[in-house]
Amino acid sequence: MVELSGRVGFLHDGSLSGEQRAAVEWLGGTGADAETLSFADLPVAGGQFDVLWWHRDAPVDGESPLAGHAGEIEGFLASGGGLLLSLRAMASVDALGVETVPPDVVDTDGVAEPSGALWRSLYDDHPAVAGFDSLRIPVCDHGAVGVARYESVLPARGEVLASTVRGGQDVPEEKTVVGWDANPGAVIGVGAPLSFAEPAAEGVTATRNALTSGCLAALADGRRQPSRPRDADGMAALRARLGDADGRPSYHFTAPANWLNDPNGLIRWDGRYHVFYQYNPAGPFHDTIHWGHATSDDLVHWRDEPVALSPSPDGPDRDGCWSGCAVDDDGTPTLLYTGGDGRTQLPCLATAADPGLRSWEKHPDNPVIEAPPDGVDVLATDHWEAEFRDHCVWRDEGRWHQIVGTGLTDRGGAVLLYTSADLREWHYEGPLLVGEGAGDTVWECPELLDLGESRLLHVSNYENVVYFLGGVEDGRFRVDGRGTLDHGDFYAPQSLTDGDRTVTFGWLPEARDVAAQWDAGWSGALSLPRVLSTGPDGRLRQRPAEEVRRLRAGQMLDAATCSVSDGERRELPVSGRSLELDLELALEDARTLELSVLESPDGSERTTVRYTQEGELVVDRTEASDDPGVTADTQRMAVPPYDEPLSLRCFVDSSVVELYANERHCLTSRVYPTREDSTGVSVAAEGGRATLSSLSAWRLADGYRY
């Protein structure tokens, strides 16, 4: 347990509860220089202490009892003092002037199993947890305990240090430990069930004591608390802090840390590419969604920008700023996004407030559509009054058009069409397309693209990204063909028109358990930029954008050739975790040809890409990782027999394998090799002879600019 070097004042409002007496008794037993201090004595004696600790278990009726002493607390912090607020006391941060957004859950938890703090790996060097070798810190194992936490909202000024672990289960959406940098002072709030009155198992008692001592010591030592980055330099420092931890890709875009999902608001403005994305600054889990932001001059080298959109505590996006798009409204960059509030999700508008698109002004009359259309049986679920979200907007024939993703009760997924003269008043035109599927299906993140000879409509149906090729006639989509955009770990893509090409990015979700994502400190990546088009046969084409070649940092092979016989495996003179492989394959008389990447020297760990005589391209993940917590299923896509010989581009990036077959078919897979030496590449054949008529390989460089 950390030794306390400073003087601690235990705050109370005149009398001590049983819980408070137990905390004082524990504090005295640590040998700390400590004494109780009533609120009334704060003006006279508060300055004698290095740390003030308010530990309150009882409910607060009305105004916080410490609110009348906010001035003394402010002065104490201004002189460099530290303040610890535990249990329900953390709910008073707004009354004390520390925070503008208080915890949204203040309650009594019935604790029946070891529960406590789920510490963020990003801050595993925080002095409060210096004595721990685990991020999971139980502090209570039974009893009814008063708690405070952030669930649907985040503190505006503070930084989340920990969420909740309960009975061995991570509960990241319950955020219970927060730090505030009140330079030169500091505040730590511990709303977890930090109970001293109830006896606990020896191990739980030890971790409770160590965490409390650690927080008090960190505050007594005058350590500044971590703060959420507010500018580009801060975001870059955040990225550098996490580094390439736990398989983080180096040239596929990821958030600086924490959570990333759907790409949003893709736009080229003043010659620069902007990618916004769904981002949670509180950790690597889906909750309290903001819009992250990055810029690039070439689509492959990125610079982190400040968070662009944050939920407004009293607005229609209180619970999250969800997916949407960006358009140029006569010279004004404009976002249309889904705002979440309780069980409601509706479209909101924001306009750029600076040329760099770093700050945005939300429309005062948001939401711009106040309800789903009358007479349409939009699906309702346990989570939402109406599944009605995600927006694609374009201008045609002098009017704005918008499609919204939804599901129709007993019918399936659907895309609804609206029109507007000004982006603010919208008229419902009817369903653009309704699926033929299960009645509980929702089509998310719809997008309608103009590919010249054809229009492409794609939707994400919780599992895959389905696309339809055809045209729009009288406000309805005519389907001429359909397919799957990517047959692997790929979801919710969004596109931008860049001259005469359509460039698309998709979200690459993780394929490992929640605990592994938490421990890594990051989650989610974006695909490489893809150019979508149709070929002379009217079928969809997909290829990496030409700019991807700019990542090439050194060539390992140049149009090499080799053949492999039945049962033979040949190691190639290529290795690494950031690679591009460009191959021409022919099965000859073999049943299969295998390309293995991220392979250990003994072959026990490898990701195998298998091309079969039946016209399938398969990613076999059964040996891809020694980690039992990752997904190990096999992914496959049809590659029609006339595609032989096969042209294959394979991009390897730590935990990403992204495949392009004949510029038509895509499969992106998430894999997590555990061995440092799993960097090899080999080929093998079964059932006969196979040939690589051309093989080129490059090492690829990092995709970030600081």
Go through the PLM ranges and name each one.
Residues 296, 352-354, 417-423:
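Conserved Ser/Thr-centered positions that define the repeating blades of beta-propeller domains
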Residues 228-264, 283-286, 300-328, 357-395, ...:
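Surface loop/turn signatures of beta-propeller and other carbohydrate-active proteins
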